[in-house]
């Protein structure tokens, strides 16, 4: 009798989803064993596929932005969030880049961090019990920017203290980054021109019909 049950993440498991005309890649994971999820991926205007290596379920790790090398079938590091945000070991980690990878007109990649994993000494991820704590909490999501031309990344700071950004979208018309807050359910707007943050509205359908958000808690 044929066996239709395969071990999760085995070679047979991955082969099940192949379709005609679809190329499936399984690049090697050396150096990324602690990551167990991906919550965003986007193709840049030049055709490069960027995605986030994320941590949840007690891995206690900071996220990576990586890109896929099609010709070599390998994952290439762009930045490790832990190198950019100067984290405290007792804080909740910046474990994800969650639905926030965007591309600026000059080719740079901009994304925001989000936390859905526990600190190493916590027994469980309890964001609403910890995020406001000075030593045990979450200082806030960071805006991180990667320049593929130079290979350098930089931290633009925390737009909203004690808030975790659940998603972000760049608006080229107004040169703004719109962000949805996980803790408070608000929409925020960051101007790349003035470097100022403005609270737009409580998370909901905006009257203009231009900004939408969805938070599941």
Tell where the protein language model's regions lie, with residue ranges:
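Short, conserved, GDST-rich strand-edge loop motifs in beta-rich repeat architectures
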Residues: 54-62, 111-138
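A short helix->beta-strand "capping" segment at the edge of beta-propeller domains
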Residues: 1-34
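Beta-strand-rich domains and repeat architectures in extracellular enzymes and scaffolds
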Residues: 25-63
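Surface loop/turn motifs at the tips and blade-to-blade linkers of beta-strand repeat domains
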Residues: 28-33, 79-82, 89-93, 156-161, ...
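Beta-propeller blade signature
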Residues: 64-73, 129-148, 189
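Blade-loop segments of beta-propeller domains
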Residues: 37-38, 63-64, 73-106, 114-116
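Residue-level detector of Asp-centered blade-edge/turn motifs that repeat once per structural unit
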Residues: 43-46, 103-106, 171-174
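Repeated scaffold domains used in trafficking and secretory/extracellular systems
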Residues: 36-40, 87-101, 163-169, 208-217
């Amino acid at each position: 009798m044929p066996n239709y049950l395969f071990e999760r993440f085995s070679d047979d498991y991955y082969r099940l989803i192949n379709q005609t005309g679809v190329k499936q890649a399984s690049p090697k994971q050396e150096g990324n064993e602690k990551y167990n999820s991906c919550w965003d991926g986007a193709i840049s205007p030049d055709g490069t596929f960027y995605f986030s290596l994320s941590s949840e379920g007690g891995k206690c790790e900071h996220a990576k932005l990586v890109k896929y090398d099609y010709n070599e079938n390998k994952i290439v590091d762009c930045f490790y969030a832990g190198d950019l945000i100067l984290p405290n070991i007792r804080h909740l980690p910046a474990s994800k880049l969650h639905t926030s990878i965007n591309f600026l007109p000059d080719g740079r990649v901009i994304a925001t961090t989000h936390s859905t994993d526990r600190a190493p000494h916590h027994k469980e991820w309890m964001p609403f019990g910890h995020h406001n704590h000075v030593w045990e909490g979450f200082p806030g999501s960071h805006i991180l920017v990667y320049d593929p031309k130079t290979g350098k990344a930089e931290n633009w700071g925390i737009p909203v203290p004690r808030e975790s950004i659940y998603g972000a979208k760049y608006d080229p018309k107004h040169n703004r980054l719109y962000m949805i807050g996980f803790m408070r359910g608000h929409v925020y707007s960051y101007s790349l021109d003035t470097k100022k943050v403005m609270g737009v509205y409580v998370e909901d359908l905006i009257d203009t019909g231009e900004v939408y958000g969805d938070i599941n808690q």
